[in-house]
Amino acid sequence: MNLRGTRFAARDFEIRTFGLRNSGAEHATEVNVSGLAGFPLAKTAASFSRRKPRDWHDMAFALPHNDSGGTTAAIASARERFIGEMAALQTALDDLQANFQDSDARGSRAYVTQMRIDHPELNPEMLAADAVIAVEEFCRGVRNSAN
């Protein structure tokens, strides 16, 4: 259970409209999705408490691949939205960073494993390096705002 992280996701969401066509009829629905600040902070807590490879993958994927400007935008959003609250995540941030300390760390391997399933043509060494850099940059950026 991830009770520490859910508060970040619950307090930072946006409404997105998704459409589909079914039997020739257009349908649209609005869905609450976690925002750029809430998602990585919730995933940081989830990675620490659940230790599931999917959480590590999601974290490393969402940082550079979000629609708002990559890891730098995620850091800025988290710092702006949750200033003064990230000190509570310091242990989880330390743990996240340790799980991406190099290309052979558990988080890096989890990211590469899933990305190779989804995109077998991608170079595993480059994937691991991308994950290490993104997570390091995020941890350093949000940690600096907590001090």
Language-model segments: what does each one mean?
Residues M1-N147:
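Compositionally biased terminal segments of proteins
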